[in-house]
Amino acid sequence: MARTHTLNKYRNIGIMAHIDAGKTTTTERILYYTGKSHKIGEVHDGAATMDWMEQEQERGITITSAATTCFWNDHRINIIDTPGHVDFTIEVERSLKVLDGAVCVFDGVAGVEPQSETVWRQADKYKVPRICFVNKLDRTGADFYRCVEMIKDRLGCKPLPIQIPIGIEADLSGVVDLVKMKAQVWKNEALGAEWEYKEIPDDLKEISQKYRTELVEMAVEQDEKLMEAYLNGEEIKEEDLVKCIRKGTLNFSFVPITTGSAFKNKGVQPLLDAVINYLPSPIDIGSINGTKPGSEDVVEMKFDDGTGFSALAFKVANDPFVGSLTFIRIYSGTIRTGTAVYNTSKDKEERVGRMLLMHANSREDIKEANTGDIVALAGLKYTITGHTLCDEANPVLLEPMEFPEPVIEIAVEPKTKADQEKMGEALGRLAKEDPSFRVTSDEESGQTIIKGMGELHLDIIVDRMKREFNVEANVGAPQVAYRETLQNASEFEYTHKKQSGGAGQFAKVKLLVEPQEPGSGRSVESKIKGGAIPKEFIPGVEKGIETISDGGILAGFPMIDYKVTILDGLHHDVDSSVLAFELAGRACFKEACTRGTLKLLEPVMRVEVVTPEDYMGDVIGDLNSRRGQISTQENRGNATVITAMVPLANMFGYINSLRSMSQGRAQYSMFFDHYSKVPQNVQDEVTKKIAG
């Protein structure tokens, strides 16, 4: 498909927020008003266009990032609707990696919620400029101004309201546009498609002027000449104000705040205008850096159709009609169907069979895609999430994505022999789609173990096995994904010697193992001098260490956060080999760690409970009984919000306890925060249970 819009008229955006803040509804309204959707789909009746998986329509939450393209005011907007449930944070992470800008949706009643903070931090990590939409102002208890304060206090940014609401709750009728200084009022009978500009109501003139003054003063800081003109009493033109707001948004000086109610069809068109006016085009980003394969040399890929092709695969999905689809963001050059592209990450050539422009679950075949496009490729054999595609003549390796370690695991067993044959294929395909989902086999029991980010995550995997692959499975109880770590530094020397006629095996290794800071991972360093261990045998030692690390020593859980230094060793000209040094490395590392004392680590979750005040005492008492540590307590409207750090092992089945103690009136959310050493009595229990 030949280019229809110049690159400066592209907007690649994500819509993200906490669960139930109204992201999918907001996206539905955007598709409706931009002409892509002839009927508005509602999340609560299971008809939302973007929520196209069966599980999503049943549960009313967005699980996978659906991509769609729409058009507004002669601009092309590629939207990715991302999930707000903490178990699917990986979807947000990989979407942000390929987006230029983001819209953060907030619930006007709840304000900034835990997952709002999580996605905000993710957007900070990838330096994604953003605007906010304070949604659901039609609901009882909504408070725009309190929400703006929460954005400032909790997210550590400078909010810049460019609108304020006219009316609130049932009386919400429109917004005051602080850039135009006009009231924008919607006509209810036209499903929000029609509105008119009016004079600002008398009762809002004073507060509108206050926020307008703050807006202008913050905006003109982006332009010295305009700042001078403003200080001299000159009126700032609307187009100059828009330019200043855009500049400040792109350089992270502030975050524009819009508002309304997507469900009540108010405020969506001005949000679209803000996307066009204030979020970046690929031209504003300019380029992306990669490296030359096999070296550290930096390669700059300019966002330009005329340069070599480069793209990042950010999602793999199974489509019931097309098969495996690989979603890519094109950073430079052009790609056409029928041509070959080079997968730098795998050093393989891929052929592009079909290329599709996606609209949630419908698709349009295209022959060509260009810089800035987000498209899906069918028929790729080797490419998975995070891989780079490019021209073989101009190879580049773009920075891959980082994926979190799973915190929960369950055993799954096929119900019949027929299911057994299909289960391996099903789990393999699901793991290819979702890098935060892992599949392993327990060597002793032969069981298949699936690992993920939470109970809901694994729930949906099992559900998809059944629906999409017709695999029936028995599912075990959820287990915590513990880790092992080192308490103290330790040094040990080990000699591996085996003689059984003919060539024997000989390897001597001396290792120093040291604990490292949490989150630092694993590292192995060689300080061998004088050829005590020849270079070709060092990988054997490293492999031995890795094998023991992966399988664990204390209780069979992977080891993390340590450093190993290979200090010395000895080899034999005939009897030494890579295998001999691998076996020596394994035994030496295991003994050194045992002498250094091993400790079990457990995932600790950040839990936020929103409860009526009447039940606060019971909720806090219950969290304390779960080894929880209360971090904060605050009032939010007529509810109390309790934040606590609680070990995941003590959170299974929490929803039922919370419903029971609050008569169904309290709710909670949780996400992984960090790994922490377990108390000795818990460690003894876990190791005893595993020992059987």
Swiss-Prot record:
Q: Which GO terms describe its biological process?
A: ribosome disassembly
Q: Which domain of life is it from?
A: Bacteria
The organism's taxonomy opens as: Bacteria, Pseudomonadati, Pseudomonadota, Alphaproteobacteria, Candidatus Pelagibacterales
Q: Which PROSITE patterns does this UniProt record tie to the protein? A: G_TR_1, G_TR_2
- Domain spans labelled tr-type G: 8-283
> Which InterPro entries does its entry note?
EFG_II, EFG_III, EFG_III/V, EFG_IV, EFG_V, EFG_V-like, EFTu-like_2, G_TR_CS
Keywords of this entry: Cytoplasm, Elongation factor, GTP-binding, Nucleotide-binding, Protein biosynthesis
Q: Locate the residues binding GTP.
A: 17-24, 81-85, 135-138
**Protein family membership:** Belongs to the TRAFAC class translation factor GTPase superfamily. Classic translation factor GTPase family. EF-G/EF-2 subfamily.
Say which species the protein is native to. Answer: Pelagibacter ubique (strain HTCC1062)
Keyword Nucleotide-binding set for record: yes
Output the Gene Ontology terms for molecular function: GTP binding; GTPase activity; guanosine tetraphosphate binding; translation elongation factor activity
**What Gene3D superfamilies would the database entry show?**
3.30.230.10, 3.30.70.240, Elongation Factor G (Translational Gtpase), domain 3, P-loop containing nucleotide triphosphate hydrolases, Translation factors
CDD domains, per this entry? EF-G (cd01886), EFG_III (cd16262), EFG_mtEFG1_IV (cd01434), EFG_mtEFG_C (cd03713), EFG_mtEFG_II (cd04088)
Gene name linked to the record: fusA
Q: Where in the cell?
A: Cytoplasm
Protein task: Catalyzes the GTP-dependent ribosomal translocation step during translation elongation. During this step, the ribosome changes from the pre-translocational (PRE) to the post-translocational (POST) state as the newly formed A-site-bound peptidyl-tRNA and P-site-bound deacylated tRNA move to the P and E sites, respectively. Catalyzes the coordinated movement of the two tRNA molecules, the mRNA and conformational changes in the ribosome.
Cellular component per GO, a single term: cytoplasm
The molecule here is called Elongation factor G
